[in-house]
């Protein structure tokens, strides 16, 4: 099950989130958590991320960000018919243009059953989200990609580095809940 919804948020609310993430005061953390050899990686991977929320608690220095992003859960319910029962994590990811096209390794965000909601902040014509079955979803501003994840299902995914923009911005929600 995969769902793609364009124009997921009303334009005003989307712009508020985008301006918050693109603001120079938004504090990023360097991450190299995808090591060489991870599900076929041939070299170390890195990107910038900001953890907003993890396991039912907001991150202290990200509280204002959490307050801005939290209303998105109402749209998950309204547009996806998805009721969030547990928030595993919410991260904002920034994949930088490194002058070459390269996909990260295939992975599930969590080994157990969960749902992934990838919300795209900007448009990248060269950086789709890829699935092992060969399908891909283009990275388009204000688009939400929603799918089931976990080791129990054949739905591993990967992302590409952008070539046409400075960075690829997305919010990654890992959730448990139910569709109705």
Model-derived regions, located:
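A short glycine-rich, His/Asp/Glu-containing loop-to-beta-strand
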Residues: 78-98
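Non-heme Fe(II)/2-oxoglutarate
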Residues: 1-83
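A structural signal for well-ordered alpha-helical segments within the folded catalytic domains
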Residues: 67-70, 115, 140
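Catalytic core of Fe(II)/2-oxoglutarate
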Residues: 90-92, 105, 111-112, 123-180
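Charged, often glycine-rich, active-site loop that binds/positions anionic groups
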Residues: 98-107
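Short, catalytically relevant binding-site loops at active-site mouths
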Residues: 33-37, 94-99
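Short, Lys/Arg-enriched, disordered terminal segments
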Residues: 1-3, 12, 122, 177-180
